Amino acid sequence: MPITLPNDLPAYDILSNEGVMVMSPGRAATQDIRPLRIGLLNLMPKKIQTENQFARLIGATPLQIDFQLIRMSDHESRNTAADHLQSFYRRFCEVEETGEKFDGLIITGAPIEHLPFEEVTYWEELTRVFRWTQSHVHSTFGVCWGGMAMAWHFHRLEKHMLDHKAFGCFRHRNLVPASPYLRGFSDDVLVPVSRWTEVRQDEVDAIPALQTLIASDQVGPCLLQDTGHRALYVFNHFEYDSTTLKDEYDRDVVSGKPINVPVNYYPDDDPSRAPTNRWRSHAHLLYGNWINEIYQTTHFDLNRIGEA
């Protein structure tokens, strides 16, 4: 089954050309099936790139997906054209006002990890989003800073600044092979990482409500399950394109910022050579498993989501 996207959203043509099954809203309306309603709260500056990355993953499942783009109400993006935001996004306050519900919500990261959470300009509204998910979303997936922010809000799990940026592709261990979110995962998983902060395993372990599903000896916890809040928190970037780390590295080199060559990414650690994507299959497994678990457990009646 396809993902439903507006015909003029850039991701529509990009994913169609990649072989992802994409359907227009008009065509979707003729099918006698309830699609899964998945929202993307996009906090990233380059919103189109992020839309494409997540739409590519959730659009590859056998289920029909109604993909909804959401942004913070008062934060104005300087890196995405206003007409794109006006055409394809709704402000969270508009979504909240309608009372509508979602089978799933992805909350992205944001390049603001150096700030204490409470100093983020839209923190108050974001905490309102977190509370709203408990009555209006069946399953929430917090990604990188978005996951850290959720874990701080619900559990006061600290984020800690690193002396050096964790940057590259790091080996991770599958700690719970029987988890429905890790079906088909290898025991050893390579995952892109790009962050200046970390959460620490001993502090995660001190919170009984959190279960670590994937972790690395080098860069710590990667994927946590928070059953009580129907949430997953992933601190690394399964969704990254093949060249995302390269783009970040090249950007920092050009701007003169101190940056190391991303670990275990370029062949022979040579930035002049094209990187090889060795995480794509696990990215599809993770988000496909998440979508499948939502499908298996959500209410058929969307309005009943959030009921005890």
UniProtKB/Swiss-Prot annotation:
Catalytic reaction list: L-homoserine + acetyl-CoA = O-acetyl-L-homoserine + CoA
Localization per record: Cytoplasm
Gene3D superfamilies, per the entry: 3.40.50.880
Protein's GO biological process: L-methionine biosynthetic process from homoserine via O-succinyl-L-homoserine and cystathionine
Amino-acid biosynthesis is among the record's keywords: yes
Pathway annotation: Amino-acid biosynthesis; L-methionine biosynthesis via de novo pathway; O-acetyl-L-homoserine from L-homoserine: step 1/1
This protein's name: Homoserine O-acetyltransferase
Sequence positions that bind substrate: K165, S194, R251
Catalytic site: C144, H237, E239
Keyword Transferase among UniProt keywords: yes
Function: Transfers an acetyl group from acetyl-CoA to L-homoserine, forming acetyl-L-homoserine.
Organism of origin: Paracoccus denitrificans (strain Pd 1222)
GO cellular component: cytoplasm
